[in-house]
């Protein structure tokens, strides 16, 4: 039965990824150790959900962090693979049956991972700022992977951060950032300060130093443009 399931999974990957992509997608390789790791992660998530474990419990946040780190590794750090896997999970009932990863599991992990970040931001933000972030963090969360995939592509293609395309990407990033950080420059500075000091905040973002550097150049150009020529 297990080889039949493996065959079925391989067929599914063939439907969603090109042969070239499959060669670099760790998930598509049949690796016993990786399969075992995911089996344990899913089993742990199911157990915590059965126990009605709150998303902000230490064990839930620790599991979500391990899950996201493994996911980033097994998608070869490529956010476009993540968006495709999400679509594949939503469209293929057999995928959910074989992996045991249900929409409820994903929801639990997403919330627990968010709580792990909110716990850090709580050290930098005041009560009002934190309440705003907590209230709005999930508003546009699902838009991030597609944006990060576009940022990776722009960086890979060596697009000029100050170009029209670069500025459009910077505007999209700023809109998503402000959706949970608000528009107060003083508050936004607290987020930037925290992100520079707390490695955990960069986990599960699929952002590399090169992509981050490109984005900083693009947002810098956007800010200069918004300020207009110096008087």
Regions flagged by a language model, labelled:
Residues 1-231:
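Amphipathic alpha-helical "stalk" segments
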């Amino acid at each position: 039965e297990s080889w039949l399931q493996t065959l079925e999974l391989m067929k599914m990957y063939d439907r969603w990824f090109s042969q070239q992509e499959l060669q670099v997608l760790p998930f598509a390789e049949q690796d016993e150790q990786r399969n075992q790791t995911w089996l344990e992660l899913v089993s742990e998530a199911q157990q915590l959900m059965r126990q009605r474990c709150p998303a902000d419990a230490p064990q839930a946040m620790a599991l979500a962090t391990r899950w996201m780190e493994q996911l980033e590794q097994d998608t070869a750090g490529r956010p476009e693979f993540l968006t495709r896997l999400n679509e594949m999970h939503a469209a293929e009932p057999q995928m959910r049956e074989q992996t045991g990863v249900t929409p409820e599991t994903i929801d639990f992990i997403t919330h627990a991972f968010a709580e792990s970040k909110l716990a850090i931001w709580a050290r930098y933000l005041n009560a009002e700022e934190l309440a705003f972030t907590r209230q709005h963090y999930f508003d546009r969360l699902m838009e991030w992977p597609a944006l990060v995939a576009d940022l990776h592509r722009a960086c890979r293609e060596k697009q000029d951060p100050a170009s029209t395309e670069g500025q459009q990407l910077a505007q999209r990033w700023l809109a998503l950032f402000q959706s949970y950080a608000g528009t107060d420059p003083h508050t936004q500075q607290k987020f930037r300060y925290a992100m520079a000091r707390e490695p955990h905040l960069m986990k599960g973002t699929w952002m590399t130093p090169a992509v981050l550097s490109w984005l900083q150049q693009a947002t810098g150009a956007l800010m200069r443009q918004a300020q207009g020529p110096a008087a």
